[in-house]
Amino acid sequence: MKRLIILFSLIFGLTATACSNGSTTGQPLVVGETPIAPESRLIDARPDWAAIPGEMAPDFSYTLADGTHKLSDLRGKLVIVNFWASWCLPCVEEMPTLDAARRTNPDLVILAVNRNESTEAISAFAPKVGVSFPLITDRDGAIGERYGVVNLPTTFFINRDGTIAVRHVGALTAERLAERLAEVR
């Protein structure tokens, strides 16, 4: 009987561990100069509509060390929402280009939304790229799904009025990024 209880406890513990999604809902953190948002939430959840140029960008919230923010709070600014993953080589290669654009354009806000990776994976990745814009966890993929993201990287350029100006699929070179930014200014 004692062995049966131990066996049951072991099976239960392993099952609970295997079913865990690996995410932690810890406090927002900063790795180097990179703010990391361990929690995000889709606000605009209309399932029948994918994000397309000319329409309002689907709203979402994210929590950083200085509080919870929403995409819609950034109206009046030029915003780039970039969907990426740490295993995606083109995503990694374009990060310095995005960071350089943010540093040279004070009114540009970049939100890098990670598709389906844990906060721990993002925290381990952050020092490798050393960007100054937030890396946002989209652990369940709801934000990316709402934006209709299939391939990575996918980048949305959002006008100051909150509408999507451009959807770009694939890595951005410095030249292509400058062209896209010129389209939305």
Language model regions located:
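Conserved redox-active cysteine motifs that mediate thiol-disulfide chemistry
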Residues: R75, F83-A100
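Active-site acidic short loop of glycosyltransferases
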Residues: R75-K77, D107, V131-S132, V149
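Hydrophobic beta-strand anchors of alpha/beta hydrolase catalytic cores
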Residues: I80-V81, I110
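N-terminal targeting signals for export/organelle localization
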Residues: M1-P58
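Structural microenvironment flanking redox-active thiols in thiol-disulfide oxidoreductases
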Residues: V92-V129, R139-R146
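Short gly/ser/thr-rich secondary-structure transition/capping motifs
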Residues: L42-I43, S61-D66, I136-D138
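A short beta-strand-turn-helix
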Residues: W49-G54, D59-V79
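Thiol/disulfide oxidoreductase modules built on the thioredoxin-like
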Residues: A124-S132, D138-V184
